[in-house]
Amino acid sequence: MLARIIMSLLGWKVHKKLPAGVDRCVMIASPHTSNWDFVFTRSAFSILNIPVRFTIKDTWFKFPLNLIFGPLGGIAINRKPRKEGEERPSTVEAMAALFEKNKNLVVLVTPEGTRSYREEWKSGFYHVAKMANVPICLGYVDYKNKVAGVGMTVYPSDDIAADMKIIMRFYKDIAPKHPEKFSVDKRYI
């Protein structure tokens, strides 16, 4: 209800749902240049009844912040780089394991990894999807057209470059809030 009010008052529209039969995926949220991106994408996914979850550093998931992040869909994981010989999963392995534990799971990822400009995206989202054998759904927030939602779905193949080119073609024309802070991954255009 609150999501509909926010989107309506601010003149935003919501576009598309998850494809039929997709109840487990890695959902990219891009462009990510402003804190408002979270408000619009989270509102859109709420309206579309997509129960998105997101991973957050376990150090942030302590009282009282866990009372905020938990209800918003946060899942605590250890994101510290694994040291040689350390017996714990990498971040990618930990995220992929979430799909083994949860029948219906949509994990939201911001592939730029920051709200600042960067020419290369982080590829962990791709490796998580590949390892978990789930598709990558392309969530977006387009400030020019005031629309947020889900675009196409990419099923990871054995050719990351070809798959990433498809993803970059989709995002290259999506208008961010701060264009000077956004770039598709230059390696794949």
Show which residues each predicted segment covers.
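Helix-enriched interaction subdomains in cytosolic or periplasmic regions
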Residues: 1-2
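Charged, glycine-interspersed solvent-exposed loop segments at helix/strand-loop junctions
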Residues: 176-189
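Soluble catalytic domains of membrane acyltransferases
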Residues: 8-173, 187-188
